[in-house]
């Protein structure tokens, strides 16, 4: 804005003895030409080069970029796939889709509630809508997801970007409530992906095999290096188990001695914090503690029998969830573990976002403050094992 002009207008308004409406037209990026010319790029500002306005990118393929590539690939093979967003085509990675399939792309503007209901109608007409929205903004659509999607059991895929810790976007944009909000909703499947291959397989399942609505969530970060177990086929309710030998074969003491299970801890994580969990597991193995990882993949449904069969082989479980603890999946699984005869002996600990809003910061700062950094995971596991 022009500050001088606004001051003149406000001074005039003070002198008018009746109600006044001042229409202030915002020029996004005013005074900085790269921002004025690319307002969508500078909607959420991370590190960038001041001289030319070029925004820093992740060194590796990001989750958003992978989604962008995969949804275009799938749409080329199936003309029933359409994409819906709410004024965030670039941020969610749908800009490539919008250029490739102009007649199958719908930007409804800043109206997330309408985006969801609109997608339900599209689904009723026989198409497969993929709705891409940030986790924080999907909170506006809770009623529509319940009434217009889940209650009708519509085959709608909701792609939640910026799930979990969201760096640089402030406390209003954290994606920490979606699991607690949507886990109780009947008919709704929820998936949390851990990397590129995991996302690809889960998107294919959600679009091609799911019979009802599916929420798939991923973080604002680069995709971590893949490990072979994530190539496992998608089975509803089941996650991906990574044993110590999968990620630390040269230093593993897995299986040594008849009583070795008593040294073992299982780290159960949602996909968005797999990287931190993996670093913690490797650190624990270096300290002589066998630590396996169970990436949940499915938040809902959850195969209790399958999980109990895995969990009973361990001494303790640490849950790592990039969502609020109250109402989260970790809290529920911990309750199940304690009440099941097969697993009631297990020691457990839950690491999740506490009951307070999240301050602005980078990803490492946010996770450390919430107790979800790799160092905090290691400490929790050692405390559980009394080491």
Feature locations, PLM:
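Thiamine diphosphate
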Residues: 1-44, 51-99, 113-116, 138, ...
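A short, small-residue-rich loop immediately preceding and capping a beta-strand
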Residues: 81-84, 104-107, 125-136, 156-159
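Extended, hydrophobic alpha-helical segments in both membrane/secreted and soluble proteins
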Residues: 93, 105, 112-132, 141-145, ...
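Structural signal for short hydrophobic segments within the conserved structured cores
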Residues: 106, 189-191, 292, 349
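Conserved glycine-bearing catalytic or ligand-binding loops at nucleotide- and phosphate-handling centers
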Residues: 192-209
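A cross-taxon signal for low-complexity, glycine/charged-rich
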Residues: 249-261
């Amino acid at each position: 804005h022009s500050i001088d002009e606004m001051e003149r207008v406000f001074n005039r308004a003070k002198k008018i003895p009746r109600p006044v409406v001042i229409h202030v037209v915002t020029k996004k990026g005013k005074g900085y030409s790269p921002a004025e010319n690319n307002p969508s790029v500078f909607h959420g500002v991370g590190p960038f080069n001041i001289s030319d306005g070029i925004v820093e990118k992740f060194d590796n393929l990001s989750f958003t970029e992978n989604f962008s590539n995969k949804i275009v690939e799938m749409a080329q093979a199936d003309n029933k796939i359409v994409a819906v967003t709410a004024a965030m085509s670039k941020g969610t990675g749908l800009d490539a889709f919008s250029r490739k399939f102009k007649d199958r792309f719908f930007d409804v503007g800043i109206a997330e509630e309408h985006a969801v209901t609109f997608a339900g109608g599209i689904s009723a007409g026989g198409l497969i809508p993929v709705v891409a929205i940030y986790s924080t903004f999907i909170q506006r659509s809770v009623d529509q997801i319940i009434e217009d999607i889940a209650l009708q059991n519509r085959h709608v895929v909701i792609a939640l970007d910026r799930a979990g810790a969201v760096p640089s976007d402030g406390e209003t944009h954290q994606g920490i409530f979606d699991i607690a909000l949507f886990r109780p909703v009947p008919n709704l499947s929820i998936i949390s992906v851990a990397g590129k291959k995991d996302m690809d397989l889960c998107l294919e399942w959600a679009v091609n095999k799911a019979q009802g609505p599916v929420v798939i969530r991923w973080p604002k970060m680069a995709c971590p290096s893949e490990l072979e177990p994530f190539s496992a086929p998608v089975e509803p309710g089941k996650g991906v188990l990574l044993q110590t030998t999968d990620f630390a074969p040269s230093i593993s003491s897995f299986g040594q001695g008849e009583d070795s299970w008593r040294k073992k801890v299982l780290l159960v994580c949602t996909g968005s914090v797999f990287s931190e969990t993996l670093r913690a597991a490797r650190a624990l193995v270096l300290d002589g503690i066998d630590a396996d990882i169970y990436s949940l993949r499915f938040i809902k449904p959850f195969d209790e029998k399958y999980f109990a069969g895995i969990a009973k082989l361990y001494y303790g479980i640490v849950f790592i969830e990039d969502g609020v603890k109250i109402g989260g999946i970790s809290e529920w699984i911990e309750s199940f573990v304690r009440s099941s005869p097969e697993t009631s002996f297990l020691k457990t600990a839950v690491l999740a976002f506490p009951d307070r809003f999240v301050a602005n910061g980078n990803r490492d700062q946010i996770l450390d403050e919430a107790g979800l950094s790799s160092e905090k995971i290691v400490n929790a596991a050692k405390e559980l094992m009394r080491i």
